[in-house]
Amino acid sequence: MAMEPSPNGSQVQNPGSLPDGLIAVVKADCPACALARPVFVDLAERADLTVYTQDDPTFPTEADWVVDDTDLAISWGLDLDAVPTLLRIEGGVETARTTGWDRDRWEEFTGVSNLGPDLPPFKPG
């Protein structure tokens, strides 16, 4: 579950107008997403995170920064294979992504330490 460049190894323009920073694409009906819910809340407070949810616009319930993607337009445009997927967007371009919950990888990816200290260190997406 390595960090990867955008699909096909190239930088692709974002579908629509995605914000720069970190983007998490999640769904409530995903065990890894449900497990990582407190991490999304934490990242929203400590980093520039936007969450796109595929199935429940109220997931995570603590958030007012969730974007409804129940029509999957963003997810399809980003060519996602699994959730949770964490993406880095710079200058309107996806520069990296990682899939599934992996504490060490997410800390490296986000530059934020001590993510989900009470969670198992790994759960595939």
Q: Which residues does each predicted region cover?
A:
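Hydrophobic beta-strand anchors of alpha/beta hydrolase catalytic cores
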Residues: 22-23, 86
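Non-catalytic, surface beta->alpha helical segment in thiol-disulfide oxidoreductase systems
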Residues: 77, 81-124
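A short beta-strand-turn-helix
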Residues: 1-22, 45
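Thiol-based oxidoreductase modules, predominantly thioredoxin-like and allied folds used
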Residues: 45-71
